[in-house]
Amino acid sequence: MYTFVVRDENSSVYAEVSRLLLATGHWKRLRRDNPRFNLMLGERNRLPFGRLGHEPGLVQLVNYYRGADKLCRKASLVKLIKTSPELAESCTWFPESYVIYPTNLKTPVAPAQNGIQPPISNSRTDEREFFLASYNRKKEDGEGNVWIAKSSAGAKGEGILISSEASELLDFIDNQGQVHVIQKYLEHPLLLEPGHRKFDIRSWVLVDHQYNIYLYREGVLRTASEPYHVDNFQDKTCHLTNHCIQKEYSKNYGKYEEGNEMFFKEFNQYLTSALNITLESSILLQIKHIIRNCLLSVEPAISTKHLPYQSFQLFGFDFMVDEELKVWLIEVNGAPACAQKLYAELCQGIVDIAISSVFPPPDVEQPQTQPAAFIKL
């Protein structure tokens, strides 16, 4: 009999994983403070990593990788992409971005030196001079100059400003209490018809204890309800596809898709009929490339291969597609929720791939085959 503890009661994904484990008859749930467990389904930000792997005779597995915030916090992701040898030169799939600290945090400002991309040595260095240099160059060249400011730890569409005025963006950040990222706004996204609407794509990615990377075959488009207008920055519903914003502010929420969600099968049909292309060839190939590059760049820093405990983690990668069908990474979520209709299959995949590979069911003699719902990258 294997044992597990649950330390995060708010995760709907791990509530379902917990239910599936108990249903096998091979797992027993212990009190959350019991140290003698095989599996910890923990809370993302307060995991006791230092205490894991020290129970004699017990293999211990936890559902997060220590250090994965390098990918999952917006400012850390920008720094990773600019400083990682694997990404800095070849990364063409991430919008131009700058890390800005509010002036009230008393952060040293990096001086601009004949260029836009700074070498980031001080992890708390503010990049506003580099942003302004790029902003002014674009203004002189007559390029599109819309930017978006986003709180590094923000979620659900909070702490966001879209503007074509550099001073407005910097003033907005300087009145906040935490680090922000200023990112070049995708002014010409691929739009859905009818409705001339924006969307983003959520892909779920599972990394097992051996750092094998699996992409969940199903993905979801989170769609806007209102027609897109690049010059109307005040109307968040045409710019931001977060469920919270669409549901609260758009009178057309649910008009085009139930819950403003479109799944890959329907999206593929749309691409085939509207653009004569397929999802796999035009978009998924790019998505797979970006996911691999991101996760492999942090592997040396977060892998548990030589630690006394083991990890796995589910990530949510969010993408946008521009009108040239180029895919852009927007952000990575380290504790993603899941569309309601996908819970059963996604969570069964977590059990089969990430948990049963470490703790095989005692009545299974043959090695388990990879679930068809996941693609190994």
From Swiss-Prot:
- Give the protein's function: Catalyzes the post-translational addition of a tyrosine to the C-terminal end of detyrosinated alpha-tubulin.
Q: Which UniProt keywords apply?
A: ATP-binding, Ligase, Magnesium, Nucleotide-binding, Potassium
Membrane-crossing residue ranges in chain numbering: none
Cofactor dependence: Mg(2+); K(+)
Asked if the record carries the keyword Nucleotide-binding, the reply is yes
The protein's organism comes out as Homo sapiens
User: Into which family does the record put it?
Assistant: Belongs to the tubulin--tyrosine ligase family.
| Molecular function as annotated in GO | ATP binding; tubulin-tyrosine ligase activity
Cleaved signal peptide residues? none
In this chain the TTL domain maps to 3-370
Coiled-coil residue spans: none
Q: Name one GO biological process term.
A: microtubule cytoskeleton organization
This protein is called Tubulin--tyrosine ligase
Q: Report which reactions are catalysed by this protein.
A: C-terminal L-alpha-aminoacyl-L-glutamyl-L-glutamyl-[tubulin] + L-tyrosine + ATP = C-terminal L-alpha-aminoacyl-L-glutamyl-L-glutamyl-L-tyrosyl-[tubulin] + ADP + phosphate + H(+)
Q: What do we know about how this protein assembles, alone or with others? A: Monomer.
Write the Enzyme Commission number(s) for this entry: 6.3.2.25
Entry GO CC: spindle microtubule
